[in-house]
From Swiss-Prot:
The lineage of its organism: Bacteria, Pseudomonadati, Pseudomonadota, Gammaproteobacteria, Enterobacterales. This is Nucleoside diphosphate kinase. It comes from Pectobacterium carotovorum subsp. carotovorum (strain PC1). The gene is ndk. Belongs to the NDK family. GO terms for cellular component: cytoplasm. Its cofactor is Mg(2+).
Length: 142
């Protein structure tokens, strides 16, 4: 197995529910190590830049508004096959299709307010990590 890093966001609806600690506990119980984390409130420029690949899609404006609606937590998770394992823990993007026990089944409110974001590939993880963290903000713990 390969040790990877993946990027994750706890979205505004999950932060508003005070679910940060519960979500972090799930990450750690699954064997992930948090190597970087911070809370922030996205500006329009940050939200549009982060989701630029979705610009022009029908859900883009609503997603940007939602991501600006409150504080978020951004974090870097490290572990074996981190990208795929985090996606498994999150559950389906549409919470109506998320398996019981996944983060989205437990904390999502809707397709947009689906509690968490996670990178979909190693390449996306690298790009997304670099969007929010400088190299000196990442603290390997092993």
């Amino acid at each position: 197995m390969t040790i990877e890093r993946t990027f994750s966001i706890v979205k505004p609806n999950a932060v508003a529910k005070n679910a940060i600690g519960s979500i972090y506990a799930r990450f750690e119980s699954a064997g992930f190590t948090l190597v970087a984390a911070k809370m922030l409130r996205l500006s329009r420029e940050q939200a549009e830049g982060f989701y630029a690949e979705h610009k022009g899609k029908p859900f883009f404006d609503g997603l940007v508004e939602f991501m600006m609606s409150g504080p978020i937590m951004v974090q870097v998770l490290e572990g074996e096959n981190a990208v795929q394992r985090n996606r498994d823990i999150m559950g389906a993007t549409n919470p109506a299709n998320a398996l019981a026990g996944t983060l989205r089944a437990d904390y999502a409110d809707s397709f947009t307010a689906n509690a968490v974001h996670g990178s979909d590939s190693i390449e996306s993880a690298q790009r997304e990590i670099a969007y929010f963290f400088s190299d000196d903000e990442i603290c390997p713990r092993a």
